[in-house]
Structure formats: C-alpha cells, structure tokens
C-alpha cells in the first residue's frame, strides 16, 4: 500500500522536526505516512483538493476553506487537546479609562495578521456582535506578519501587543494562551493591562481528509495517531513542540464564530479573490 500523504504548513522550522518524529512513530506502527510540506495554508488546501495529499493538518481557517470548497464533504479528523475551547482576549491598559466595548468607538484597535482567526477574524465578528462595525466604528491597525500562515506565526499578535505597550493602539487582541504566556514571561505586566472582553470559546487546528479518501484508512490514521503517549519520552519531545499532551477526537462545532466572521467580512472572496 502506498504511504498516506499528510500535509503540514511550515510556519516554523520545527515543523519538519515534529513531522519527522510523527512519521517515525507511524513507521514503527506499520502504518507508514509521508509528510508533505507547504509554505502556506492556501497551497495546502489546494494540494488536498488536487489529491497531492490525502490528509491535511489544517488551521481553523484552512478547515473552513476546505469545508466550503468541498461543500462539506471533506473528512474531519483529530485535534490536539489544546485546540478545544480557546478564547481571544481584548486587552487594554489599566490606566486607559477604557472600561467597556463602547469606549473603543472611534479608537484604534490592534489586530494580528489579516488571516489570523484568533487575532483578527473572530475578534472582528465579536466586536460586530457587540455593536462595533468593522470599517466604521473603529480604526483597524493590523500587523501582517506571516500572511498565509493563518496566525500560526505569532509575530503579528506580538507586535500588536507591543504597540499597546507603546500607546500606538487603544486595545489589542490575542489568543488566551498567548496572553497567559506573555504575562508569565514578562512581555506584558499584569498590573499594567487588563482584559476588557473575551470571545466565546472556539476551536483551533484539525485534520482534514480528502472527500474520496477511504474512510477506513482515515480512521486507521486517527487510531494510530491517538496511540502517541505523552508519558513516552520519545513522544513527549514532539508533543511539547506541537503544544499538546493528547490527541483527541475532532469536532466542528467550534468553528461557528469563524464561519460567521467569513460571512460578515466576505473574507475568502477578498483574500483569495474568489
């Protein structure tokens, strides 16, 4: 049987190390896979639909792109334990006199890259639901680092956080995990910033399978993947790099806010020219 081809986007050099370890594990489990690398998520989704690969390790936005372009027929696979129930935080300075969303009317708000679900798309939809309309009620200051990587490159999010510290923006958006990390490492001082608003929970990355991929083969891939054990030192290294302790069953209910954001902004039409 030919190797199952699995796509991954190189948002960081460590990605090839991660997938080298995963491929070795699958080889040892007598279910060989071949990692195929892409420079951005659009290329990966294009590759999946063109059958260059059988499975894609997708960002939430790449999942939505795949879902829409296959009219909902793509297969949905596993997630990391850390992909579920994420939230984005709207952060302001404690001395800013900004105490409500409405206080941001006509102010400048910092966002991550144009295609970041957590630092731009879901936040814009959140503001919309709370009465602040994009392009009208506030000024967007965007930090386009790693466009095409769907916010996996944290640079834009970090630059926006630094802009808040430097009073270049009145507020900034960041993923909950990044907020916690930046408070812990001193990038942000918890005495100088506060969380003004939090989005509802959403989910992050997920495996997508080509609609015509044999379902039993896809399920076997998932079964083997779930055998990875954080207590096994040879697995732990990879799992730490990939930010998980356990592979879990995927779900798509956590992509509702991102789906709404795409509809509100007509994002794919603008971004891909479709």
Where are these regions (language model features)?
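Ligand-binding "clamshell"
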Residues: 2, 66-78, 134, 182-196
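Bilobed "Venus flytrap"/periplasmic-binding protein-like clamshell domains
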Residues: 3-29, 38, 61, 85-160, ...
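Active-site/pore-lining binding-face segments in mid-to-C-terminal subdomains
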Residues: 176-214
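An extracytoplasmic/periplasmic, membrane-proximal ligand-sensing/linker region
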Residues: 2-5, 13-18, 202, 208-209, ...
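Short Pro/Gly-enriched coil loops immediately N-terminal to beta-strands
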Residues: 77-87, 196-203
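N-terminal low-complexity or amphipathic/hydrophobic leaders
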Residues: 42-66
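Hydrophobic residues within well-ordered alpha-helices
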Residues: 48-49, 104, 164-165
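A ligand-binding cleft/hinge motif common to bilobed small-molecule-binding domains
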Residues: 57-70, 123, 128-129, 158-190
